[in-house]
Amino acid sequence: MERFIVGTGRCGSTLLSQMLAEHPGALSVFELFNGLDWARRFAPEPISGESYGALIAAEQPMVTAVLRRGYEVAEIIYPFETGRHRRGDPLPWILVAMLPRLSDDPDALFDEVMAHVKGHPPQPALAHHRMLFAWLLERLGKRFWLERSGSSFDYFGELIRNFPAARFLHIHRDGPEAALSMVHHHAYRLPISLIYGAPLDDGARLADLGPLDLHAAPTGRDPISRVLASRPPPALFGRYWCDQVLHGYRALRNLDADRYAEVRFEDLVERPREVLGAIAAFFALPEGGDWIARAAGLVRGIPESRVPELERAERDALEAACRAGQVLLGRA
């Protein structure tokens, strides 16, 4: 069985992936598909193993731009102090979060992965993904894999089409809180501000800044630095969150009910053993000892609400932007 955790981003999916990684048989794949070239990650045309290696080892320019300007991103756990790459280098995508979660020496595992995939026969990217997962299972002594990427509910339809027998667990969080978490998360702040043309703190518009070069060196006043330093309107992030929920629910029409389940982030945190037991049953996980007890120990409580910090007008605009998604999730 193929298993996926999907969500909007800033919804608790990272915690859930960490929890499921406590199962001794689990290969918990963090952040693979969301950082790959969207036009190529599931393209049907055959590609060589070398081309596939280039696909998964390419940098994600948004991530590079954020790190190059000194911002921390909690999900990026590559060991810059001891690894071969330094902060601001064009970090290969699978070294951003995936391989550091699987090995204490991600650079060495990266080299092994690259050597392995270059030997793949010409085939579509999807077949390469499956071969990579199978190799990692054998290499790391695991029994099953599950993949989780931030904002994957946005391309849920692609996952359903490409993994027609998979089961999908959707974890969701209160919309305004998820949106405000994105505002404070610079790897979300940059792309969402660019997508929706968020105004800068000084009143400038993105359209007035000229061409945006994600690869340009930071100067402090370059357009990317100015976007990252500004506080964009929370309602734009509510709109982004809501758009993802709408995209995901449209894709549900093509999925059998027994292949889909939902869990609230708040329930996972408040009743972790009960919720994890239900997730294990849905995913038909094999017996794994006391992994649920260990996983429950990872909970640190629900983050403090940010909504009360907003001025009334901002809060009303944010809640309005999120309303359609909240209704679909049964939260309004």
What are these regions (language model features)?
Residues L15, Y155-R161:
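A short acidic, amphipathic alpha-helical/loop segment
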Residues V6-T8, L146-S152, H172-R173, F265:
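Short His-Asn-centered micro-motif
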Residues T14-A26:
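A conserved segment at the C-terminal end of the G1
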Residues R148-S149, L159-H184:
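Conserved phosphate-donor/acceptor-positioning beta-strand/loop module used by diverse small-molecule
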